[in-house]
Amino acid sequence: MNTRSLTRFVLAGALLASFKASAVPGLWQQGYGQGNAEYSVTDASGKMFTINCTGNPDQNGFYQHSVFLTQTNNRIVSSHDDGTTITVVMNHQQYAIPSSLGWRNGDNAWYSFIMDIRKARQFEIYVNDRKAGTFSADPTNAAKVLPTPGDCGND
């Protein structure tokens, strides 16, 4: 794990700790800190799915947005983790979350995910092809809270 990933985990942990204290299952909430907007939803068991939209571009000028899954044992899995694939299934479609952005297929996949997560009433998370959680979400709340592709993309 490199220093950049470690910094993200520390930031994510701080933000997630504040989210967990007041998280109502099924309602998206937003937090912001150090150039990162984070959008999280919890399930009834306490698992949390987070979309991280960074405002800090990498050395090539690309925004390396990501997702996190915080499990009930507080283990955090990130789409940036080496050897980890995260797939979101919603509305009978799968969305493989790219491990990095700044290339056409990755940016297109991220755009589709951000567009469609706003409309999902329920979605499943798979980590390395194993189901890791099922989340229900209120679409009205999602439309108010979640980012648009322009707020969380590489346009």
Question: Could you say what each language-model-derived stretch is?
Answer:
Residues 18-20:
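N-terminal signal peptide c-region/cleavage motif recognized by signal peptidases
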Residues 22-155:
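A generic "folded-domain core" signal
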Residues 1-10:
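Bacterial N-terminal signal peptides that target proteins for export
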